Amino acid sequence: MSKASVYEAKTESFIQPILDSMNFELVDVEYVKEGGMNYLRAYIDKEGGITVDDCEVVARQMNEILDREDYIPDSYTFEVSSPGLGRPLKKEKDYVRNMNKEIEIRTYRAINKSKEFYGLLKAYDKDTVTITDEDGNETTFNKSDIALIRQALDF
């Protein structure tokens, strides 16, 4: 297990009770290096959407825990954010939330001369994702072939 995975798992275990008490959902935790800086990020959500004030309350409570537990020896910045509209589907609850909604799939290699697919999410399991396009055609993708899967953005 990488040190990033250890930090993420430990952070999840500390932040989850805070979020549960507020009826918020933990979407993801990531520990990444960007531009020479380390970032520990928690992405949270709730029915109706997360506000800046929500993020601030969670960050304040979590910062107390991070200072007390001090399990990350490196210098880092802790951020709490809404996951944003274009976030990838990663966890089971992301798939459940997006059932029968329009999603975008990008594949690593072209399938029938295309790498981008749009359709309604109809089914998923640990290995596959099935969508139905606007013509009613059903396509099943192996998750190992998917580079990106997210809710489609309508503009």
Curated annotation (Swiss-Prot):
Transmembrane segments: none annotated. Disulfide bonds: none annotated. Pfam families: DUF150_C, RimP_N. Keywords: Cytoplasm, Ribosome biogenesis. It is found in: Cytoplasm. InterPro entries: Ribosome_maturation_RimP (IPR003728), RimP_C (IPR028998), RimP_C_sf (IPR036847), RimP_N (IPR028989), RimP_N_sf (IPR035956). It comes from the Bacteria. GO terms for cellular component: cytosol. SUPFAM superfamilies: YhbC-like, C-terminal domain, YhbC-like, N-terminal domain. The keyword Cell membrane does not apply. CDD domains: YlxS_C (cd01734). GO terms for biological process: ribosomal small subunit assembly; translation. Required for maturation of 30S ribosomal subunits. Belongs to the RimP family. This is Ribosome maturation factor RimP. It comes from Agathobacter rectalis (strain ATCC 33656 / DSM 3377 / JCM 17463 / KCTC 5835 / VPI 0990) (Eubacterium rectale).
